[in-house]
């Protein structure tokens, strides 16, 4: 299930690269969240989950829609007009680093330990390695990769803010936030992209948008929450290691993308930082307990 989720989320960068041929960023993101919204609400109704009427819930999911959908989706999609999908996926893997820093500042119960601090520093060291070289075959500056890091920061804010929905059915929270982000994106897409002037998208673009929305968003959320319930949040950190690998395989295999050696080194350093944060590979195995024979 972890590998499946990593392929779905890694595939979002791949689908973006294809769809950007015909669609501008805001319209593409609007298609993603609006189609995903319809799928998620269908699941909510299928499971007969009660829809809250409390205004605080809807205000909360509106904030989540901005932090977890609107801001990061738009930033990442725009960045992919400048950098490869593989590099965007690598930089997006810094999300847990930002989540830890934000939780340390914003909460009293999730302070950084020495091990996690070292892991965060190592992870950002990997970012420095990546930023130390051009981000593609031509000079595109730092704006596009910085946009991905800002998206990761926004995801981190959403991760901390979203803990207030611990008692809410996760699929309901997901449907609420994609609904809110759809409503926020609609006027932006109309005013900026003027989609009625866009050419008719090709079949490959339509399929990419459907894959982006239904697989990499709606199905990915459903699978994410299933793993969270079955395996716990700590095991989901493994997905962060696997997403860039999936994106690199898809980008290199189907889009002809090539990463510089420094990008691969940077990814490895970020991965090392995440492993240090996770801590399980560094912990000493517990000695086997003697088995007391039963009568």
Where are these regions (language model features)?
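Juxtamembrane helix-loop-helix junctions in multi-pass membrane proteins
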Residues: 7-37, 78, 84-86, 157-181
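C-terminal transmembrane-helix exit sites in multi-pass transporters
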Residues: 39-51, 96-118, 245-265
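Juxtamembrane helix-entry segments on the extracytoplasmic side of multipass membrane proteins
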Residues: 21-30, 53-59, 117, 132-154, ...
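Specific transmembrane alpha-helical segments of multi-pass solute transporters/efflux pumps
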Residues: 8, 12-13, 41-92, 127-129, ...
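Hydrophobic/aromatic residues within transmembrane alpha-helices
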Residues: 19, 28, 32, 79, ...
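Helix-helix packing/entry segments at the starts of transmembrane helices
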Residues: 29-31, 69, 88-94, 160-183, ...
């Amino acid at each position: 299930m972890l590998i499946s989720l990593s392929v779905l989320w890694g595939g979002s960068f791949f689908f973006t690269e294809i769809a950007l041929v015909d669609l501008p960023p805001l319209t593409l993101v609007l298609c993603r969240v609006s189609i995903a919204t319809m799928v998620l609400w269908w699941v909510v109704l299928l499971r007969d989950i009660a829809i809250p009427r409390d205004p605080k819930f809807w205000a909360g999911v509106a904030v989540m829609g901005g932090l977890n959908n609107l801001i990061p989706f738009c930033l990442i999609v725009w960045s992919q007009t400048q950098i490869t999908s593989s590099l965007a996926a690598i930089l997006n893997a810094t999300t847990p680093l930002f989540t830890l820093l934000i939780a340390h500042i914003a909460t009293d119960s999730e302070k950084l330990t020495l091990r996690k601090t070292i892991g965060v520093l190592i992870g950002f060291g990997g970012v420095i390695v990546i930023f130390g070289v051009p981000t593609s075959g031509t000079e595109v500056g730092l704006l596009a990769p910085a946009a991905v890091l800002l998206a990761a920061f926004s995801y981190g804010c959403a991760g901390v803010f979203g803990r207030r929905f611990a008692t809410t059915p996760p699929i309901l929270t997901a449907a609420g936030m994609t609904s809110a982000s759809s409503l926020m994106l609609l006027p932006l897409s109309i005013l900026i992209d003027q989609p009625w002037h866009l050419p008719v998208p090709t079949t490959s673009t339509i399929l990419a948008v459907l894959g982006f929305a239904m697989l990499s968003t709606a199905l990915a959320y459903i699978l994410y929450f299933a793993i969270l319930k079955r395996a716990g949040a700590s095991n989901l950190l493994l997905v962060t290691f696997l997403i860039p690998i999936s994106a690199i395989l898809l980008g290199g295999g189907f889009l002809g993308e090539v990463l510089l050696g420094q990008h691969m080194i940077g990814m490895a350093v970020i991965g090392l930082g995440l492993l240090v944060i996770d801590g399980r590979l560094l912990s000493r195995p517990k000695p086997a307990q003697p088995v007391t024979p039963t009568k």
